[in-house]
């Protein structure tokens, strides 16, 4: 099961992770990556609008043989429903998925909340903030916390959107814009 890359940011990460994995295989290239991603999507019975919807469709409705999702969603499903129900399979290579968080100047200036907003942003990456993230199955980036949770989060070779795809703007235009590779792959289904 897979969310729709046209409507879900998380699905874009998933799609690009599969593409990146294919590129990094021996003799990997864009054509082989396109073939792999097309093969994956030929097996998707339903494209939900987002990751949580895909998880619900897969876990609760039993639709599909495989769920491609955020790491935390997979761990949560296994912990809630039992290790005998699902196996989490990690690829040898994936994307460093870091959804953006930012202080929006126009908003904080209008509301006078810059210090609070910046404190929150700083807290997210503090040791304490990363402890909270890790307890909720998000892979921590703080070195101390990452070490404490190393058994929960297997080591992965991670690539970035910038290095592999030339940044989000280029990836969006190439893969997810109307007529892009996702449309070429999925509309042929």
Which residues fall in each region the model found?
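A conserved helix-loop-strand patch within extracytoplasmic ligand-binding domains
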Residues: 1-20
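Second-shell loop/turn segments in exported
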Residues: 1-5, 41-45, 106-109
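Short secondary-structure boundary segments
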Residues: 4, 71, 136
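Short helix-loop capping/hinge motifs at secondary-structure junctions, enriched
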Residues: 7, 20-28, 107-117
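Solvent-exposed, polar/charged alpha-helical surfaces in well-ordered, non-transmembrane soluble domains
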Residues: 16, 20, 38, 56, ...
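Ligand-binding pocket segment of bilobal, Venus flytrap-like solute-binding proteins
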Residues: 20-91
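Small-molecule pocket liners
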Residues: 97-101
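Extracellular/periplasmic juxtamembrane helices and adjacent flexible linkers that interface
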Residues: 106-189
């Amino acid at each position: 099961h897979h969310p729709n890359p046209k409507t879900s940011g998380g699905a874009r990460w998933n799609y690009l992770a599969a593409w990146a994995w294919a590129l990094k295989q021996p003799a990997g290239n864009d054509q082989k990556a396109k073939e792999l991603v097309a093969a994956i999507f030929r097996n998707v019975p339903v494209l939900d609008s987002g990751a949580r919807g895909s998880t619900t469709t897969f876990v609760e409705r039993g639709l599909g043989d495989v769920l491609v999702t955020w790491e935390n969603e997979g761990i949560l499903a296994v912990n809630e429903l039992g290790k005998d129900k699902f196996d989490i399979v990690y690829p040898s290579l994936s994307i460093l998925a870091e959804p953006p968080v930012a202080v929006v100047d126009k908003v904080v200036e209008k509301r006078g909340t810059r210090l609070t907003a910046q404190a929150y942003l700083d807290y997210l990456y503090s040791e304490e903030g990363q402890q909270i993230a890790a307890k909720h199955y998000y892979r921590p980036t703080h070195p101390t916390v990452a070490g404490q949770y190393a058994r929960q989060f297997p080591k992965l070779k991670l690539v970035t959107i910038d290095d592999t795809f030339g940044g989000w703007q280029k990836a969006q235009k190439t893969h997810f814009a109307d007529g892009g590779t996702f449309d070429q792959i999925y509309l042929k289904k």
